[in-house]
């Protein structure tokens, strides 16, 4: 979590703000583990206990303002107040909070602006039945089949492209975390909870697919 916090801080601080910068953009892949650990410790030294505890939690949009509908698609003043009082580590958005590209980007931006500490802005975009963004035609996001279908028919090149494309398109909407892919190996065909959300029954094959997807999403600055 400490290193992840550093990456989010760097992502937000190096994001464009409409002005040219004379500072060279720092790439996280250029930093080794020891450097990241040191940066993380420096950041957390300046954080209060309340803020540190808050970083352990990811909340839904509805939990930030329970007076509003769970289908909320805009940031309310209460949401901003809640984030200020309870500095959560991240916010997850579901399909009911995602309507159009402009609306989604505005919402993720306003939530980030309302938080003292940069947020993990998360979504579930696995492909197939769990596609919070691509399932909405108005979002015009590239749709992918189920993990089962990907594992059965995609080669390494297509899998890498899938990770890159998902990462790029999610980043454009203001997300920096994808709660995917599912790493479960399908060991029980009667497990309907996982079902076609798994890439297959072979653990090595599943591990290779997961690794490829995650690496390519991370290249787009999406935590996965």
PLM region descriptions:
Residues 53-54, 88, 116-118, 219-222:
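Short coil/turn connectors at secondary-structure junctions
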Residues 19-46, 52-54, 69, 77:
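N-terminal, intrinsically disordered, polar/charged segments of Gram-positive cell-envelope systems
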Residues 209-224:
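Phosphate/pyrophosphate-binding betaalpha-module
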Residues 62-66, 72, 82-209:
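Enzymes and membrane/adaptor proteins characterized by extended Gly/Ser/Thr/Asp/Glu-rich
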Residues 55-59:
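A short, Trp-centered hydrophobic/proline-enriched beta-strand micro-motif
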Residues 1-9:
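Sec-dependent N-terminal signal peptides
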């Amino acid at each position: 979590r400490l290193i992840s916090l550093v990456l989010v801080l760097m992502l937000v601080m190096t994001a464009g703000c409409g002005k040219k910068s004379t500072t060279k953009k720092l790439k996280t892949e250029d930093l080794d583990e020891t450097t990241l650990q040191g940066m993380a410790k420096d950041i957390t030294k300046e954080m209060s206990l309340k803020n540190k505890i808050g970083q352990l939690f990811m909340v839904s949009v509805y939990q930030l303002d329970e007076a509003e509908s769970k289908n909320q698609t805009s940031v309310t003043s209460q949401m901003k107040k809640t984030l200020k009082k309870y500095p959560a580590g991240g916010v997850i958005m579901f399909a009911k909070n995602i309507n159009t590209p402009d609306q989604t980007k505005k919402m993720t931006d306003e939530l980030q602006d309302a938080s003292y500490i940069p947020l993990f802005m998360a979504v579930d975009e696995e492909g197939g039945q769990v596609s919070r963004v691509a399932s909405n035609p108005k979002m015009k996001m590239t749709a992918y089949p189920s993990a089962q279908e990907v594992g059965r028919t995609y080669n390494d090149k297509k899998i890498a492209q899938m990770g890159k494309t998902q990462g790029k398109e999610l980043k454009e909407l203001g997300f920096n975390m994808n709660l995917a892919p599912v790493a479960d190996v399908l060991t029980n065909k009667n497990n309907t909870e996982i079902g076609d959300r798994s890439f297959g029954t072979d653990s090595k094959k599943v591990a290779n697919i997961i690794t490829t997807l995650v690496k390519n999403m991370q290249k787009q600055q999406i935590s996965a």
